[in-house]
Amino acid sequence: MYNNYVDLAPVNANWNEDILIRMPSGGWQQAWFRCYSPKPSQVVNLSRAITSVMQDKFNPTAGGPDVQTAVDPWSRVDYDERIPGAGTMLSDYYSYGQLLLEQQQIWNGPVYSECGNNYYYSGLTTGSGGCDHGYDFDKKPWLVDFYLRKMQPLSCNWSLGYGDRSEKDCDRFFAKTIAFGMPCGFLGGWRLNLDYLMIRGYYMLQQLQSNYCNAFIKDIRYANAKGELLDVSKAISTGAYKRSQIRLEYDNGLVIWINGNNEENWKIPKANLPPTGYYARMPDGTLEEFSAINNGERIDYVSSPDYDYIDGRGNWFEAPKGATDGQLIILKNKDGSREIIPNGSKKIAIALEQKPEAIIALDKDRKEIGQSAVEPRGGYFYIQPVPGAFSYLLKFR
């Protein structure tokens, strides 16, 4: 549930000149356009009054106090001499912290704020947007230790980007989100139609983030020009961290290699990573995924308990679980059946231990529109397309 205790407009029913932050000059603290900032000492009372109305009307289970973690603690200091702690950052920091903690109790669920200065509030809120307005992640080195070791155990911030729309920008958006151990924001948001970039973003990140967001970082290494993996102290002293080629190991065994370099490929034991490429694997093999070079072309692949994802990016790509020249999603249903969803694919094939008993073509409303057939060839079962089919449900004996 959206709520805001940083921007108060004169048309608000709670407007009162005496609850506004006073500057050293005695003037009101300006906030967003046509708005002024309420006193930090008053925001908890405002929250309690407003959230009780929200609960009665909507009964939400999560909150979004906007702007709260976008501003640094010293930019909303109240200099009103009538207020205890006037002119100190501690008074507003304490009040904002109490607000964020209380909201989690009120909603009995997560509370996420905006972004920009969220590191000051780690542990006080469930999380915030991951953007740091003062740092250019697309051009500057990725130094991930502070976030992964200090912030991530306290708060789960999300998404290092704004929904970039080119393929190159999206690749970098995904890679930096993985490098900093964040869940990925839904690319493009609700404003845009579902397209191949959104599909790629969801399937490349969903299973991977389910593993690293539920674990703590164990080891961080940065590669130098020789491929040697250095700890952060040696990486900084030698300048190797500027290459942004990072190996992460989490305490659940997950290992991730991310090439944040803008120009150079990075050959690792299991893959050849292009700029913004990555490789991840759980030690038991339940999850393996990569965005890497295959036969000179970049491809994307996920093998996981819930689904397999194969993306040839317009080129024919033969993966362990299937093959396609577009995007291919293989959903693994609990009853043992498989739903095959192609997108932009001229040919699709899947690797199966046995031939399906039935292949049912479904439309977008999941209505049956016919039967398909498979042709075994080259270690795969090639699915014969059915006009108008959105997906194919494979059933086995």
Regions found by a protein language model. Name each.
Residues Y2-D18:
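Active-site cradle of extracellular carbohydrate-active enzymes
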Residues A13-Q354:
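Active-site-proximal substrate-binding groove within the catalytic cores of carbohydrate-active enzymes
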Residues S244-I246, V255, G379-F381, F390-Y392:
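Short beta-strand micro-motifs in enzyme catalytic cores
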Residues Y250, N343, P376, P385-P387:
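Surface-exposed coil/turn segments at beta-strand junctions on protein surfaces, enriched
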Residues F290, I360-Y380:
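Solvent-exposed beta-strand/loop surfaces of large extracellular or lumenal domains
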Residues K347-L352, Y380-V386:
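Exposed aromatic-hydrophobic patches
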Residues P387-R397:
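Surface-exposed interaction regions enriched in Ser/Thr/Asp/Glu
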